[in-house]
Design a protein with these regions (language model features):
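Beta-rich catalytic cores
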Residues: 30
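Mg2+/Mn2+-dependent nuclease catalytic core
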Residues: 51-70
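Conserved catalytic cores of phosphodiester-cleaving nucleases, focusing on short active-site segments
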Residues: 34-36, 41-52
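Acidic, Ser/Thr-rich peripheral helices and adjacent loops at domain boundaries
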Residues: 97-106
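Charged phosphate-binding loop/patch that engages nucleotide di/tri-phosphates or the phosphate backbone
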Residues: 108-131
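Acidic-basic catalytic patches of nuclease active cores, encompassing PD-(D/E)XK
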Residues: 1-25, 39, 131
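Nucleic-acid nuclease catalytic cores
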Residues: 67-98
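Extended, alpha-helix-rich binding/interface surfaces that flank or overlap catalytic cores
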Residues: 88-90, 106, 110
Length: 131
């Protein structure tokens, strides 16, 4: 099982107020990994990333998706310690910030962060709708 699949399972297990649909799409490159639906009936997308350093890797298609769809899109990053699987933290960014995230990596201040999915839920789920 890949690291992003493990991240999805942790997120799904600990965010029971959100209905998740995993989007495994090979025909539309760049489509985010998850479609979420919260208690308020709002839909949003989430791109999942797992990294062991400050840099976060995105494909050109993923960047293009978030540039084209900046509202109600998010990027959730699980940061692990270098050369280990020890969790450092979870970082949540709005999709509209993808260009900054590409250049600055995890040095960019997140919109929300925590040490587990439930702490993120208290801080950020659901994020306030963007204007």
């Amino acid at each position: 099982m890949g690291p992003e699949r493990k991240l999805y399972l942790k997120l799904k297990k600990n965010t029971d107020r959100i209905k998740w649909t995993r989007l495994e799409n090979i025909s539309l490159l760049g489509t985010p990994d998850l479609l979420g639906n919260n208690d308020s009936g709002n839909f949003f997308t989430v791109e999942l990333k797992v990294t062991k350093g400050k840099k976060v890797k995105f494909s050109p298609h993923q960047i293009a998706f978030h540039v084209e769809h900046p509202h109600n899109s998010h990027i959730l990053i699980e940061a692990l310690g270098p050369r280990s699987s020890k969790l450092i933290g979870w970082y949540l960014y709005r999709g509209s910030r993808i260009k900054e995230l590409v250049t600055q990596g995890l040095r960019l201040e997140p919109d929300a962060w925590g040490s587990d999915p439930s702490s993120l839920m208290l801080v950020a789920w659901p994020l306030e709708p963007e204007a």
